[in-house]
Design a protein with these regions (language model features):
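Alpha-helical transmembrane segments and immediately membrane-proximal extracytoplasmic
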Residues: 1-497, 501-515
Length: 515
């Protein structure tokens, strides 16, 4: 049989190369870009907080002016130009994965949203807000990978879902330098399932993003390595149980506050949010500044420095620190600006560990702090496996793995008595069916009241955190509720994203109260 001519081999090789590139190269390139973006974003946030600290050291009272001003500006810019960038970003990713990615990703994972997420979270940390960068990094990673779908000639829902999942997991892994946590996070929190076909893609993306992060930052653990000693204390089991209950109650109350804003926030403030959301944001900024001054500046920022200082013994904090930090954290999320809750939750948990050390004086303080960190994080996220894997990798605490697992499990169960899973509940808002159209006159009047986003932006904008507030006890008659809805009809852009796919579960009582 004669050999084919050499020129005839080139088209076959070209087609094979393109097929290999589309099958593997896009994921590899995306993972590398996600790792690079995570490192650069972390450095930007760190620089922003150092700038805030330098300004505060120059003038202690400056946050009273700076924080409200930045809060107002951030909310105005978010609502005007970057609807979909609010909050941590993880609910947006979950909503995209649980529905048709092409429909939800086109609104929640665009490059415009990515830019707004980075920009406004930087402004938030520059103003001293109690926000983290890890949650936003998840949305940034998912958005970067999702936008690579255009390299596929025939993109489908399966490819898009794999891109989003791999980008989100790689983003979390690169943000914390915790590769195992990235895998567990994708399985437990994002999809609640395991696909053998997607596992190879997921692990490859995490490896490549992690290699980039390690190459730029070096091999490190997020909180360093703690010393647990050669022998565990006799009261370790009691300490695990008490810590899990305390942090479970605290984390559950935090989730309840975010998901039931209409039940505890005064009516005047709710009305202020509906009519003047920018003014409401300025008041939240003022509250953050006042709490920060009362705490001596320890509640500003994500809390990473405070948590690490407690772990290595270089810092002493008041027993009121975790409560003040919780107040600042709630005030940071009520306005609806971009920002994560992972790092602040770890800081609050460290504060509770420091508080409980007054009870368990014979225990190692770093050990107790590690237990409290995993307990509070598990209570807030209600993802116990992800929580203990994250903390275990961050402190290199393999010796504590059983204690961390037990604390995370008990704490997440205690938290569920107070509130449902936070991220899943927030994701349901994006999956909820659209609000029926209102009369043009009512829509115009409502638009004049909010004065935030033009009606033509409605299809690209998810719901606002405090819009269409309602009690969940069902005591209000349907007719009265309909009349009240007509009287206080939100603008079209406040109605939430139009659910274009029937795969998204329709929830009648979606979380309209929190961000």
């Amino acid at each position: 049989m004669p050999r084919p001519a050499l020129p005839s081999l080139f088209p076959a090789l070209t087609r094979r190369s393109l097929r290999i590139w589309r099958q593997y190269g896009v994921f590899w390139l995306g993972a590398i870009v996600v790792g690079l973006a995570a490192v650069l974003y972390a450095r930007l946030i760190d620089w922003g907080y150092e700038t805030f600290r330098a300004m505060r050291d120059h003038a202690v009272w400056l946050p009273l002016l700076l924080t409200p001003a930045i809060a107002a500006m951030s909310v105005w810019v978010t609502r005007r130009f970057f609807r979909g960038a609010e909050g941590s970003g993880i609910p947006q990713v979950i909503a995209t994965l649980h529905a048709r990615p092409s429909a939800f990703g086109a609104r929640l994972l665009t490059l415009r949203i990515l830019f707004g997420k980075v920009l406004i979270s930087f402004l938030g940390i520059l103003g001293g807000f109690t926000i983290g960068r890890e949650g936003p990094t998840v949305q940034v990673g998912a958005a970067l990978m999702f936008n690579l779908r255009r390299f596929y000639p025939r993109s489908n829902a399966q490819i898009e879902r794999q891109l989003v999942l791999a980008g989100a997991a790689a983003g979390l892994s690169a943000a914390f330098n915790t590769p195992l946590a990235g895998i567990v996070f994708a399985i437990e929190e994002l999809t609640r399932s395991f696909s053998a076909r997607a596992s190879g893609v997921l692990i490859t993306a995490i490896i490549l993003a992690g290699v980039v992060a390690l190459g730029l930052n070096g091999n490190y653990t997020y909180f360093g390595t703690i010393d647990t000693g050669l022998h565990f204390p006799k009261l370790l089991a009691v300490a695990v149980l008490v810590t899990a209950i305390v942090t479970g109650i605290a984390g559950g109350l935090f989730c309840w506050l975010l998901l039931n804003t209409g039940r505890w926030l005064p009516g005047q403030l709710l009305g202020l949010y509906r009519e003047r959301p920018v003014t409401f944001a300025a008041l939240c900024g003022l509250a953050i500044a006042v709490v920060g001054l009362v705490s001596g500046g320890t509640t500003f920022g994500s809390g990473y420095a405070e948590a690490r200082g407690l772990l290595d013994g270089s810092q002493q904090l008041s027993v009121f620190y975790p409560f003040l930090k919780m107040v600042s954290m709630v005030a940071s999320y009520l306005p609806g600006i971009p920002g994560g809750i992972f790092a602040p939750s770890l800081s609050i948990g460290a504060g509770f560990g420091n508080l409980l050390h007054a009870v368990f004086t014979n225990m190692s303080l770093p050990m107790l702090i590690a237990l409290a960190m995993v307990g509070y994080l598990a209570a807030v996220t209600q993802s116990p496996i992800t929580s203990f894997v994250i903390v275990m990798e961050m402190i290199n605490g393999h010796a504590l793995v059983i204690s961390l697992m037990a604390t995370a499990l008990v704490s997440s169960r205690v938290s569920r008595f107070f509130a449902p899973p936070l991220y899943e509940t927030l994701a349901q808002r994006y999956l909820a069916p659209p609000v029926p159209a209102v009369a043009p006159a009512a829509a115009t009047a409502a638009s004049n009241v909010t004065d935030v986003t033009e009606p033509q932006d409605a299809n690209a904008a998810p719901a606002d955190p405090l819009d269409t507030l309602r009690d969940e006890d069902g005591s209000e008659p349907a007719a009265a509720a309909a009349a009240d809805s007509a009287a206080h009809a939100p603008a079209p852009h406040d109605a939430g994203p139009a659910a274009t796919d029937a795969n998204g579960p329709a929830q009648q009582h979606g979380p309209r109260d929190a961000q």
